[in-house]
Amino acid sequence: MPLSYQHFRRLLLLDNEAGPLEEELPRLADEDLNHRVAEDLNLQLPNVSIPWTHKVGNFTGLYSSTIPVFNPDWLTPSFPDIHLHQDLIQKCEQFVGPLTTNERRRLKLIMPARFYPKVTKYFPLDKGIKPYYPENVVNHYFKTRHYLHTLWKAGILYKRESTHSASFCGSPYSWEQELQHGSTSLNGEKGHGTEPFCAQSSGILSRPPVGSTIQSKFQQSRLGLQHKQGQLANGKQGRSGRLRSRVHTPTRWPSGVEPSGTGHSDNLATRSTSCFHQSEVRKKANPSLSTSKGHTSTGHAVELNTVPPSTVGSESKGSVFSCWWLQFRNTEPCSDYCLSHIINLLEDWGPCYEHGEHHIRTPKTPSRVTGGVFLVDKNPHNTTESRLVVDFSQFSRGTTRVSWPKFAVPNLQSLTNLLSSNLSWLSLDVSAAFYHLPLHPAAMPHLLVGSSGLSRYVARVSSTSRIYNHQHGTLQNLHHSCSRNLYVSLLLLYQTFGRKLHLYSHPIILGFRKIPMGVGLSPFLLAQFTSAICSVVRRAFPHCLAFSYMDDLVLGAKSVQHLESLYTAVTNFLLSVGIHLNTAKTKWWGYSLHFMGYIIGSWGTLPQEHIVHKIKDCFRKLPVNRPIDWKVCQRIVGLLGFAAPFTQCGYPALMPLYACITAKQAFVFSPTYKAFLCKQYMNLYPVARQRPGLCQVFADATPTGWGLAIGHQRMRGTFVAPLPIHTAELLAACFARSRSGADIIGTDNSVVLSRKYTSFPWLLGCAANWILRGTSFVYVPSALNPADDPSRGRLGLCRPLLRLPFRPTTGRTSLYADSPPVPSHLPARVHFASPLHVAWRPP
């Protein structure tokens, strides 16, 4: 006969009419009973032949992937001028006095951050933008390309200009200024890694007349065409104080994408003479453009008379130029949907390439990418804006994977101990938190994203058109890419992007200047950064509480008025060091803080309402007596596991599900087990804050007996059959709690101390979790444990009762930094009547 739910509750001692605990509880450790109950509840894992269920509510498992939804109206989020000040440490010291060792070490980690993996795989540019939306290939290409362009303009990305140079926008850091082109001495340079580079403001190279004298100045080498040493090598001071740099290595292509061919001169000429026709048109209109001028970030103007890398091919090919987009201008339309109709809409499509405000030397950067990108909704609640997903998973895979540094995440009890109080709370929203932290330029070659240009991208993902390397740029295959879909897509995109369609249709390679989200190092660095900043704020305002997890910052104060003044002071400090806050998203919580999925108040912690709603929804859709795919079980356990500490039986109640996932078997929910779990999760109990106190109750056990010391009273008992020592110790702790009601118990068993009851027999683990809920444990060495003698049957001997204090812990999160013993060296502040008692400290 199947086990009923009421009978099962009585078995787990969850009802009050159970017998004496000392008799009932040891029975739950019996292996035979556990097996019989598992059979009755259908918790065994038979190999079922019935087809598995792969979907429960929103949870999907094997063989069913959710189809991503593309939104053609996605907006690209704007990125403010994010620039974390380099003198961050000095500004913090002005604010709070000398920094602690921990704070200084953490802030130095991110100024700048460094990332040097052992092995980096490079992928062809075609894999730069992932064809994530097969139905919206062109739309997705341009929206992603626009997102990348926005990041570059915001100073978050470097743009690869050549093998050894890159450009960027925004304010340069000192380590970037040391690498600037043209800012170092140009005498005695070694190799091409130190060559100066010139910005071209128009992005178009002007071509002087081709002549054989120029050709002789170059020599062929393993790295392509190299300038002969000694010619034009010395910088000369111009009459207006301008620095005249020597010609950059001719293997630099304006697009930042070098040809993948073997270096044949005809190929080089075609690829390098970017938009030859358009630059000629512009030269006639504006003769001053014949010598491109730009500015390096030091403010000196740098002049560059550009030299064609080859003459062999340019003469034979005539005026065939490599700008795929503009080639359509001079061709006959092939159909009503020919791209030439769109290209002829505008006379001036703007430059083919843009260059940044500043240029630096970089380590060798191939014309490849190391990760693909695609767009998704910003979050489930905001589908109007897009978010860029960067896939750098290569660094987490294989034998050469990077082992990311670990960092402490506050567990539920630590969080409750720290934040459960009668404070008023608010949350601060840091805009694009990851993009605050600068990366060293030497890490750029490992974190490359980009695209191969529209023509190659369309050719790769469409089955009708093909562009082959040896034909690239020739008129025969130009119209192969014309199609109705492409024509309609481009016409619609023209409404949005206008002449930028031309710029975005060119290839580009970008490297990260700030830490990207797709690398395991980034969460670690962000956690170090925000925890150091919060530590500084806590020491500046010792009567308040500041705490962070990743980019989530919370402030607490005794009263709302005090919180308002604290908010003003802290936001001014954060803005002064370059941390960009989105003040519109500041949330004032009152006395119940919403943080990390929890609601934390003076009464303790509970899961947020939306999580409770998800759990109810999950149980409503959970099928009974049907095998559920173990992958779906993983998703269910992920949701239920988050709320498990708030239930009677906790994690042990989920052990049958964990077992099926480990065995990779389907799981069948029996009506009784589902009803048991459902009842568990419908009544949630808050996790309370631990209070400091003195331990006066001790428990100990041997395999055959147990002993308690409650104040000056001693008790002992024996088990019917010998038990494993950990099980015996757990039973002793349960007896101590039930007999004394004390919430602080001393024990010498590390497994009981850890409060992880999932390794015990299933029924015992569930019952013990409920009995010991809210109990704090203190470690007492066996030799000093007053309950040691009673557990061995010796009641006559009384060891002196220890005075063991219990102090609640906040874990390894190093959240609360006390003021250092050194004087603060701050000018005397104007004191105001604080609404707080001076002696009050955060919990």
UniProtKB/Swiss-Prot annotation:
Swiss-Prot/TrEMBL catalytic activity: DNA(n) + a 2'-deoxyribonucleoside 5'-triphosphate = DNA(n+1) + diphosphate; Endonucleolytic cleavage to 5'-phosphomonoester
UniProt-annotated site: Priming of reverse-transcription by covalently linking the first nucleotide of the (-)DNA, residues: 63
Residue span of region Spacer: 178-346
Biased composition (Polar residues): 262-277, 287-299
InterPro entries listed in its UniProt record: DNA/RNA_pol_sf, DNApol_viral_C, DNApol_viral_N, HBV_DPOL, Rev_trsase/Diguanyl_cyclase, RT_dom, Viral_Replic_Matur_Polypro
Region (Polymerase/reverse transcriptase domain (RT)): 347-690
Keyword field: DNA replication, DNA-binding, DNA-directed DNA polymerase, Endonuclease, Host-virus interaction, Hydrolase, Inhibition of host innate immune response by virus, Inhibition of host RLR pathway by virus, Magnesium, Metal-binding, Multifunctional enzyme, Nuclease, Nucleotidyltransferase, RNA-directed DNA polymerase, Transferase, Viral immunoevasion
Positions of the UniProt region annotated as Disordered: 180-202, 226-315
Gene3D superfamilies, per database record: 3.30.70.270
Biased composition (Basic residues): 239-249
BP GO terms, sorted: DNA replication; symbiont-mediated suppression of host innate immune response
GO molecular function: DNA binding; DNA-directed DNA polymerase activity; metal ion binding; RNA-directed DNA polymerase activity; RNA-DNA hybrid ribonuclease activity
Location of the region described as Terminal protein domain (TP) in the Swiss-Prot/TrEMBL record: 1-177
Activity regulation field: Activated by host HSP70 and HSP40 in vitro to be able to bind the epsilon loop of the pgRNA. Because deletion of the RNase H region renders the protein partly chaperone-independent, the chaperones may be needed indirectly to relieve occlusion of the RNA-binding site by this domain. Inhibited by several reverse-transcriptase inhibitors: Lamivudine, Adefovir and Entecavir.
Annotated function: Multifunctional enzyme that converts the viral RNA genome into dsDNA in viral cytoplasmic capsids. This enzyme displays a DNA polymerase activity that can copy either DNA or RNA templates, and a ribonuclease H (RNase H) activity that cleaves the RNA strand of RNA-DNA heteroduplexes in a partially processive 3'- to 5'-endonucleasic mode. Neo-synthesized pregenomic RNA (pgRNA) are encapsidated together with the P protein, and reverse-transcribed inside the nucleocapsid.
Family annotation (PANTHER family): PEPTIDASE A2 DOMAIN-CONTAINING PROTEIN-RELATED, POL PROTEIN
Entry's family note: Belongs to the hepadnaviridae P protein family.
Additional information: Hepadnaviral virions contain probably just one P protein molecule per particle.
Name of the featured protein: Protein P
